[in-house]
Amino acid sequence: MSPSVEVTPAHTPTSYEVTNSLDSYRGYDHVHWYVGNAKQAASFYITRMGFSPIAYKGLETGSRDVTTHVVGNGQVRFAFSSALRTGEPQADEIHAHLVKHGDAVKDVAFEVDNVEQLFSAAVKKGVRVISEPKVLKDAHGSVTYAVISTYGDTTHTLIERGSYEGAFLPGFVDTSANKDPIAAFLPNIELMHIDHCVGNQDWNEMDNACKYYEETLGFHRFWSVDDKDICTEFSALKSVVMASPNEKIKMPVNEPAVGKKKSQIEEYIDFYDGPGIQHIALRTDCILDTVRDLRARGVEFISVPGSYYENMKERLAKSSLKLEEKFEDIQALNILIDFDEGGYLLQLFTKPLMDRPTVFIEIIQRRNFEGFGAGNFKSLFEAIEREQAKRGNL
């Protein structure tokens, strides 16, 4: 039976008075992708990345124009939407997005304490509105949401879940009982949550994007590096990490810098046809197991040269830091290390998940370290440049 959904406007103050609610972010809610085949995209993350079915909306639930499959792992939730036909606004929007960008992230949703108050404050400060607050209701309760624009065609949905008890959102049916039989034959993958989502900008657009987050959403500059820190023989980039007031959400923003050849950021902009989400970092508590098991499932990661580990071993020997993991295991899995005297992170990046060299996934583990792998950027860039060269895009 199709779920019954009621949609009503929320009671947003018409005066849009500034409130102190720009600090009400609870964290990432989900990442929404527009793809050509939502069923197959969801299946990829189930079989390759170890996600599980969460919820579904489509013809069987009364959604005649768009279908959405939701999958998750830990607190990570990805929603994949595809158009079922043309001639309806959202379906046509998905078609247009696919033609321009290919399969890609459309929306990064934030869970907040109070949508109406945060939206009011953001509108007063000049946020670009896509959809004013609305309330969705079904038998499991209600959810309030609003949608705002960020860079390019990317949006942020603000979601207030309250005491909602459904699997995902009103209008979806629970699919958590639909276990994929192949899971019994594959290693289990344990992820925690989304650590950060990175957006790429075109030339000289990073500052504008950062100012937008600062001025409208109350974010602040958490961390930054310039082209002197992130460069190779051939290319360079600049990066600023924007964080919500409580630092539960971090959105790094990149732009290309002048180099001898085309950088990975320029390649992304060329094939994505504009600014957008470059990668999503997924946090794990044991990256050795996670990467080993993802490789066993067929996930392809970038390669790191042996010289990186020779240099890293020398750096570690000169510091007081002690790794909990065996260095040999880290090297065997091609995992990158960054550290200071207080802690360290371990990270590794997949190859692009699409035929277009656009979106990829990062697997990250933190041990008392809140940086973003600046010490790895040169090695990472060189590894990505090797892949670019194979594609004829360097």
Curated annotation (Swiss-Prot):
EC number, as in UniProt: 1.13.11.27
Catalytic activity: 3-(4-hydroxyphenyl)pyruvate + O2 = homogentisate + CO2
Binding site for Fe cation: H196, H279, E362
Keyword terms of this UniProt record: Dioxygenase, Iron, Metal-binding, Oxidoreductase, Phenylalanine catabolism, Repeat, Tyrosine catabolism
Cross-referenced InterPro entries: 4OHPhenylPyrv_dOase, 4OHPhenylPyrv_dOase_C, 4OHPhenylPyrv_dOase_N, Glyas_Bleomycin-R_OHBP_Dase, Glyas_Fos-R_dOase_dom, VOC
Alphabetized Gene3D superfamilies for the sequence: 2,3-Dihydroxybiphenyl 1,2-Dioxygenase, domain 1 (3.10.180.10)
Top-level lineage group: Eukaryota
VOC domain boundaries: 27-161, 193-351
Name listed for the protein in its UniProt record: 4-hydroxyphenylpyruvate dioxygenase
Organism encoding this protein: Yarrowia lipolytica (strain CLIB 122 / E 150)
